[in-house]
Each structure stands twice: as structure tokens, then as C-alpha cells.
Regions:
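Cationic, low-complexity basic patches in intrinsically disordered or flexible, solvent-exposed regions
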Residues: 3, 7-9, 17, 28-29
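Cysteine-centered motifs
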Residues: 37-40
Length: 315
């Protein structure tokens, strides 16, 4: 279980020399291991008060609990961010790495370079517009095998309260993680369908009566409309196309979500980190895919997918 592990200290960044060329014997390797353990032992006593991580940014992974646990995962390490609330974090971008082709070209959208955004099956239009899914018809968009894998599995249409009630769609396997990523403090399933196309069709019908957007500023300020999602669920039932009514989830319950936030921003101000830009701030909370810092600064971590980040944490 992830939260049982402590973040790893990057010993090769603490000792400023080419460690790999230095290691010529097993004895020297053992010495370096002892030094790494020594630094880890000293850190709780504030004798070592900084940690360094670097890697390709992907969206934060989460663990559903009484309070959501957040993790930043890199290739050789990960950060349990909850441990570092109210501590100083510095981030700088030192390049790009496309999530599809791994090129160093600037990121265009969604973690992809421009070429991959328009060509990779990972960025097909049906991802944003589920009603365009065609795998159930055995018709390819960009890669039929991949599209079948994603589209031809159970999907859920839901209502979530991210400040106001909105309708959305996700794969069944992504419940409740999709709601966490949106910063919803509560959510409920409406219908469950066997594929993405049917769920997308239902969502299109519901969008005529309900919003499908999140007001990110309202969500981050924790301004929440006092609503009854069970009542909204029953109302939504009347908007579902008749050929999909039998997919209605009669027994679904409201799921409550609590985020690790010490202080919400009054006037959230979005921070963008591009190549050679550095940002520092005291971490005050995490909600959705946002890091909340002091002075109303917020960082949409997922919006930086494909960026190469150096992250330093000072306790």
C-alpha cells in the first residue's frame, strides 16, 4: 500500500559528484548505501531538511480514504504529498517529454507534442466527446485495438458537486478517482452502461438540462452549493433517453470526499511553469489535481503532464 512508504531521498543529488563513475568496487557501493541510510536517519531530526525529486509529470495518483492521499509518481521514486503540507516546495521545469513518443518537443496539449496530439490513439477526440466512440461498431478512429480496450468496458454517467452540480462520464474502473480529480466533495452514479458510446449518448441528453463544466475557481475556494444529489439523480432519470432507462442505477449512494487542505484560497491565481521557470511556495492543500499554495497561488498539476520537473521540498 503506497502510504506505507516514505519518499526516497535522492542521494545522487545530495552528493555533488558523478557517483556512478566513482563506484569502482563493491566496497565503495556499500559505503554509498550506508551514506544513503545515514541521511534518511538524520532527516526526522531536522539535520537533513531537504528532499529532491525529478521526472516526467503525470497526473497525481490518489488513494481514497477518510482524507484523500495524493502521490506524485516518477520513474524511480514517488512523493506522498500529504506529508508535506505547510512546507516549502520549489518546482522548476527543465524540459519536456511527450507522454506518447517521449520526444523533447514542447508539449502541445494533454501531455502530448503537437504531432502525437493529432495522431496518437491516446488523444483521440472520442476521449473528450464519448458520443463519438465507434469501437462498438468495429470502426477505428486511430487504433481499433486500443479503442476497443478502453471503449468496450463498463462506463458510468454520474452527477458530482464540484461547487455546483455537474454531469459527467467515466469508466467504471475510475470510480471514485475521476470525482477526486475533479475536486468534487460528493458524487453519485446515475447509470452504468456496457460501453463508452451509450454512456456518451446519455451524457449528451443530460447536458441539455445540466452543466458538464467545473468552475475551477469556485471549486478551489470551496464554495459549495447546498444540494441534495439524490433528488438530482431522480430528476436526471426523467432526462435519460428511453432506450437507456434500463441502465439506471437504482441503488447508487452518494459518495463523500474529503481533501487534505489547511487553507483554501480567497482569490485563486493559476501558476504556469514552463521550461526554465521556477516557482516556490508553502503548500497549503491539495484538491482535484491542484496544488494550493500560500498567497492564493494554485498549480494545476495535471495541466503540466509531459513537463520535466525538479521538485525540492524543505521541511
Amino acid at each position: 500500500i503506497k502510504h506505507h512508504f516514505e519518499p526516497q531521498l535522492d542521494i545522487f543529488q545530495i552528493i555533488q559528484f558523478d557517483a556512478f563513475s566513482f563506484l569502482g568496487t563493491r566496497k565503495q557501493l556499500n559505503l554509498l548505501w550506508v551514506l544513503a541510510c545515514f541521511f534518511c536517519i538524520l532527516r526526522p531530526f531536522n539535520l537533513i531538511n531537504f528532499m529532491h525529486f525529478k521526472g516526467v509529470v503525470k497526473k497525481m495518483t490518489t488513494e481514497f480514504n477518510s482524507t484523500i492521499n495524493y502521490f506524485v509518481e516518477f520513474e524511480n521514486s514517488f512523493i506522498h504529498l500529504n506529508q508535506f503540507l505547510d512546507q516549502e516546495i520549489s518546482i522548476n521545469c527543465f524540459g519536456y517529454n511527450c507522454l506518447s513518443c517521449s520526444s523533447a518537443q514542447p508539449i502541445f496539449r494533454q501531455g502530448f507534442c503537437k504531432s502525437c496530439f493529432f495522431e496518437s490513439p491516446l488523444a483521440g477526440e472520442w476521449i473528450i466527446k464519448p458520443e463519438l466512440s465507434k469501437a462498438h461498431l468495429n470502426i477505428a478512429d486511430r487504433d481499433l485495438d486500443y479503442e476497443k480496450k478502453i471503449q468496450l468496458q463498463p462506463h458510468v454517467v454520474y452527477l458530482s458537486n464540484t461547487g455546483s452540480v455537474k454531469v459527467g462520464i467515466t469508466r467504471k474502473s475510475q470510480v471514485p478517482y475521476r470525482w477526486i480529480d475533479q475536486g468534487a466533495h460528493e458524487a453519485i452514479e446515475i447509470i452504468e452502461t456496457p460501453n463508452r458510446f451509450l454512456a456518451g449518448t446519455a451524457e449528451v441528453a443530460l447536458k441539455k438540462y445540466m452543466s458538464d463544466k467545473t468552475n475551477w475557481r469556485k471549486m478551489l475556494k470551496n464554495e459549495i452549493d447546498n444540494v441534495n444529489l439524490l433528488n438530482f439523480k431522480e430528476q436526471a432519470k426523467t432526462y435519460i433517453p428511453s432506450n437507456l432507462e434500463h441502465y439506471f442505477n437504482v441503488n447508487s449512494k452518494v459518495v463523500k470526499i474529503n481533501f487534505p487542505v489547511l487553507k483554501y484560497p480567497d482569490k485563486p491565481r493559476s501558476v504556469k511553469i514552463t521550461k526554465d521557470v521556477e516557482f516556490s511556495g508553502r503548500l497549503k492543500g491539495i484538491k482535484g489535481q491542484y496544488l494550493i499554495f500560500e498567497n492564493n497561488n494554485v498549480l494545476n498539476f495535471r495541466a503540466h503532464e509531459g513537463h520535466l520537473f525538479n521538485i525540492s521540498i524543505k521541511s
